[in-house]
């Protein structure tokens, strides 16, 4: 092809391109997606926020919902702080944040609870084991229980019970020992009528007695058929277990099993021996 023919072909191509019309802007806008908004521009956003709020509210309600036994436990502990004063359901709901007015099963559990007194009209109060409020009440109660009273049970009666027990111990109006099953004290009355006068000679003899060490005392008790208190024995075993920790053994894996019993010194002649 000569130069004149090439130029003619090029001009035809340019004319063909110019004959093709570009799509107008109106055509593009016709295919543009425009979401339909009903009821104003802000209603869609408001509805979306409302649905999110509703979902979050329901989720929070499900998380905060507690089982019935936990609700009753919280209510019993709250009533205990009132020291026998009755409380209605409104006060209970306000103080415990548990909505129980629309839960008849919770009210039924409260009525049948042995630690709660039902006063009627949805009014409840805590029922302690001992009805005491002062130090004098404690001193009057103790003679009726020769086996002693647990301080934890006495503390259910009123908030300052443990403080009053401590004061009675300091003034030696009561005696206290540790319970074998727990760390709680058992208190007894200090009855002056049970005091027996002793001679100074007998007191000196008592003080001169030397107690054996703990190991010998335990052996002598076992020889006499007496058992050691479980709490003391278990504590001693726990302490000895901590002191006697076994040392971990290092596990070595043998890889060259084909020469496991091979000793390279077997064929080496010893010093002073004749060569083979």
UniProtKB/Swiss-Prot annotation:
The keyword Transcription applies. GO terms for biological process: transcription initiation at RNA polymerase II promoter. Keywords: DNA-binding, Nucleus, Transcription, Transcription regulation. Residues 256-276 are annotated as: Disordered. InterPro entries: TFA2_E-tether, TFA2_Winged_2, TFIIE-bsu, TFIIE_bsu_DNA-bd. GO terms for cellular component: transcription factor TFIIE complex. Its main location: nucleus. PROSITE patterns: TFIIE_BETA_C (PS51351). Transmembrane segments: none annotated. It is found in: Nucleus. One of its GO terms (molecular function) is DNA binding. Belongs to the TFIIE beta subunit family. Tetramer of two alpha and two beta chains. Recruits TFIIH to the initiation complex and stimulates the RNA polymerase II C-terminal domain kinase and DNA-dependent ATPase activities of TFIIH. Both TFIIH and TFIIE are required for promoter clearance by RNA polymerase. This is General transcription factor IIE subunit 2. It comes from Dictyostelium discoideum.
